[in-house]
């Protein structure tokens, strides 16, 4: 199993984070019509206690706040609010993440 990391810009990965198999962290993207020229660049920040699940893609300039779970095959393109569960293309909050230890 592997993850793909395209780090032409800075990637900040917090403590206790998981980046699952086949997930992609992309700090730049291109377009075949521009003959390989970079279309978009930006750093990625993933704060503490996050989980980027299988096949998820994190696009340039994205910021995943503390405690977020990005569901399988989610597409992160922007900022996700802390302690939420986010899924979809683009990934949006579907609910609050509650830790059993906090109950």
Language-model features: locations:
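Beta-rich strand-turn-strand
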Residues: 54-78
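Residue-level marker of beta-strand positions
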Residues: 16, 49-51, 67-69, 75, ...
